[in-house]
């Protein structure tokens, strides 16, 4: 009987004591750091344009950007940047200083506005090629299966040779 009671006490302790496996995360860096790294090791840049108040941005962080296939591919093939569309700090890029425009309560960052062609939508995913040229800005929440297709299409520069519709039909998901 003592052994039974002891096992009832020990087993739950052991179950809850097991550390959870470490979750992989995307190596988010600043825009400036991505530009700097690109000089010595050119890679495309994925930019997640978000705001602090955006519910769908938080949902995308908690789901799409936690999917292991997505995390691994982005970390291997892109410089990943989180760009707060309402940040107040200046960003220097291509001999231009991008600033926050607006007042304390409402405004946007010029870089976010430039990348999104003035069509402010959050979240938005922006792809720059290795030469730091805008390839595509995609507005809205992206579920993991769609993101997986997009990062492969952009990361491997398939867009240079193949239409999206053809690629979309041929793509084999790992999710």
Residue ranges and their predicted role:
Residues 80, 111-114, 120-138:
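A short, hydrophobic beta-strand/beta-hairpin element that forms part of a small beta-sheet core
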Residues 27-45, 74:
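A short beta-strand-turn-helix
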Residues 134-175:
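Thiol-/selenol-based redox modules, centered on thioredoxin-like
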Residues 97-119:
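Short, internal strand/loop/helix patches
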């Amino acid at each position: 009987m003592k052994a039974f009671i002891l096992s009832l006490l020990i087993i739950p302790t052991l179950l809850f004591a097991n550390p959870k496996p470490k979750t992989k995360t995307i190596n988010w860096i600043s825009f400036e750091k991505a530009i700097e790294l690109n000089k010595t090791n050119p890679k495309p840049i994925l930019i997640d344009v978000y705001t602090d108040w955006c519910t769908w941005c938080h949902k995308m962080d908690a789901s799409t950007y936690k999917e292991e296939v997505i995390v691994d591919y982005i970390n291997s093939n892109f410089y990943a940047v989180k760009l707060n569309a309402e940040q107040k700090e200046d960003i220097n890029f291509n001999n231009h200083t991008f600033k926050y425009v607006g007042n304390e309560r409402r405004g946007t960052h010029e870089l976010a506005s430039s990348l999104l062609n003035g069509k402010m939508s959050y979240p938005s995913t922006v792809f720059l090629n290795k030469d730091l040229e805008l390839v595509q800005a995609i507005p809205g929440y992206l579920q993991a299966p769609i993101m997986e297709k997009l990062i492969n299409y952009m990361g491997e520069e398939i867009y240079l040779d193949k239409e999206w519709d053809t690629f979309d039909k041929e793509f084999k998901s790992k999710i």
